[in-house]
Amino acid sequence: MYGMLYESVQHYVQEEYGVDIWRKVCHIIDCKHNSFKTHQIYPDKLMPDIAEALSACTGESFDFCMNFFGRCFVRFFSNFGYDKMIRSTGRYFCDFLQSIDNIHLIMRFTYPKMKSPSMQLTNMDDNGAVILYRSSRTGMSKYLIGQMTEVAREFYGLEIKAYVIESQNDISGGTAGPIKLTDGPLTVIVKYRLDFDNREYMAKRVNTEAHPSQLKMPTVKLDVFLDLFPFTFVLNHDMKITHAGEKIVETWIMHNPGANPKSFIGTHVMDLFQCRRPKDTTIDWDTLIQMRAVLFEFELIRTGHNRAAYDAVLNMDFENYDEMDLNEAQTMALAKAQEFSESHPVDDDESAREDEIDPATGERRSSQGLRSILLKGQMFYIKDVDSLIFLCSPLIENLDELHGIGLYLNDLNPHGLSRELVMAGWQHCSKLEIMFEKEEQRSDELEKSLELADSWKRQGDELLYSMIPRPIAERMRLSEEQVCQSFEEVSVIFLEVMNVYDEGLNSIQGAMQTVNTLNKVFSALDEEIISPFVYKVETVGMVYMAVSGAPDVNPLHAEHACDLALRVMKKFKAHDMGDVAIRVGINSGPVVAGVVGQKVPRYCLFGDTVNTASRMESSSDPWKIQLSKYTGDKVRQVGYKVESRGTVQVKGKGDMETYWLLEGPEG
């Protein structure tokens, strides 16, 4: 949602409940925003969260708070001058209800990412009206009631009572629409009854319908209608086109030269057009009947094009065309188009040139392919034929675009200012919006690419930190040459997994089983590593090596190393591992640590301390933790329970006194 909605909430909560209540609300929901920016997007869920927090602070119900927020918005947008727009929609409240969707269309440039709901006036009587609300958001039904109530009171002097008659997919307290696994998000549909004094509007409506000028109007043939609106088409209950104007059929043939011209009549409208406005609208009879007051924009779908065929159709001489049946004219046009298509095939190079961009203007060259045509108009119900007619005109910016579409000035509606606007180079809002939407789509794609790049960077960092400690990696990023460091004292841990290989299996099966077992054991060990107290150095074969005290200096390195060994022993003893066993050796002393290698850099430890720790592990017994004398004396002083093993013959060291680690100071 845009910040203006939250600005209104913040302003009136502070005004009516006080600044302290607002601060308390922000504290409850952990809102970091001290203020909101009008044109910035904020999370939708923030609105119900504020309502729940305000309800907890004031004792009012959640529905009351959402209703209050809706009233706040109407009172607040007058600061931006939007009250003038509301007052201009009509003399009566019902006029406003019929214009809500068109108001949202007007606002789409100021708030281009606005996900506006759709509202249609479905029924009226002396005592009020019924409106149908569609939205991708849930939990906003009470918010809308607050808006309607305040608009009626503020601009029309009416006191209304609004309540929900029917509701589909609306979830109180949330804003994200419900999900259907097969079709994705579901549309929230709510039907409201608004009770108010509507007698004056209904009387005006009855008087208008009963006026003598209406009763004496002569019958008009549909052919005359189609001549006046050459781009219009008529729809039946199945949304199939039953009649169409001459120019829309010719344009469709030019854009689809390989199609059967007779197939235009009788085809579902959504097979020929894409509905651009209103967005996300289901095109069916009931919906269009309810949305007759809403402006529609349909874009003709193109399936193929051949410029020679187009020009052939454009240059056809339709003699006695008024006396011809429309289908016969279509057949003639198709025959001419197909004749030129066969004799002037489009090669690959020409097809590629259709999407060329003029380097001087940045626009696509209209002479190298037809652009799709955009129709803007309104649906009207014709009672005599029980059909809907889409009265429209094409949106064309200038003469270049006119030719790019494949039309001429005399093809446009004979009435209105269509031709004058094209001659003047009028900038249609809908064309600008299409350009904006394309740029917005590119922006979204760029944003997704950046998010993907960030994700790859995080994965790369995680992989790097698995090979090199984070502090060392950060130093290398800063191009510091010093990647080698000496430590006065650390504790080195070696752990070996024993009896992994099953002699009864063949070599391949045994190797696979060994790898699976080692993977489980080492993965469990990784979970026990608590950085920065202990750092995993490497695994070699069946041996796991870790260190405490490097690369982050830790005066309690011996204690943390022993704690790790005890946790590991306890964890694996609790599981039935069969013949598999582990043994651990720990030694403390000085080491030198650094990054070795360039293509596959590794963080390595060097020194006699490492060798002694390895000997402690290799001379240990299964399910035992062997400590060097120095490490044993060090941890015994702080309460660890150790047992003297005596003297052990250590390769390269001779006789060494060692200890068994039994348990920690807490038992």
Swiss-Prot record:
The segment(s) forming the Guanylate cyclase domain are 491-617
What is the name of this protein? Soluble guanylate cyclase 89Da
Q: Where is this chain compositionally biased, Acidic residues type?
A: 347-358
Q: Which GO terms describe its molecular function?
A: enzyme binding; GTP binding; guanylate cyclase activity; heme binding; metal ion binding
Q: Where is this region: Disordered?
A: 337-364
According to its UniProt record, the EC number is: 4.6.1.2
Which top-level enzyme class is recorded in the Swiss-Prot or TrEMBL entry? lyase
**Cofactor(s) of this protein:** heme
The record's listing under PROSITE patterns reads:
GUANYLATE_CYCLASE_1 (PS00452), GUANYLATE_CYCLASE_2 (PS50125)
Which gene specifies this protein's sequence?
Answer: Gyc89Da
| Coiled coil location | 427-455
The compartments listed are: Cytoplasm
The entry assigns this protein to a family as follows:
Belongs to the adenylyl cyclase class-4/guanylyl cyclase family.
Query: What functional role does this protein have?
Result: Heterodimers with Gyc-89Da and Gyc-89Db are activated in response to changing oxygen concentrations, alerting flies to hypoxic environments. Under normal oxygen concentrations, oxygen binds to the heme group and results in low levels of guanylyl cyclase activity. When exposed to reduced oxygen concentrations, the oxygen dissociates from the heme group resulting in activation of the enzyme.
Q: Which UniProt keywords apply?
A: cGMP biosynthesis, Coiled coil, Cytoplasm, GTP-binding, Heme, Iron, Lyase, Magnesium, Manganese, Metal-binding, Nucleotide-binding
Lineage: superkingdom: Eukaryota
Q: Its quaternary structure?
A: Heterodimer; with Gyc88E, in the presence of magnesium or manganese.
InterPro entries (UniProt xref):
A/G_cyclase, A/G_cyclase_CS, H-NOX_domain_sf, Heme_NO-bd, HNOB_dom_associated, HNOB_dom_associated_sf, NO_sig/Golgi_transp_ligand-bd, Nucleotide_cyclase
Looking up Gene3D superfamilies in the UniProt record yields: 6.10.250.780, H-NOX domain, Haem NO binding associated domain, Nucleotide cyclase
Q: Which Pfam families match?
A: Guanylate_cyc, HNOB, HNOBA
Organism of origin is Drosophila melanogaster (Fruit fly)
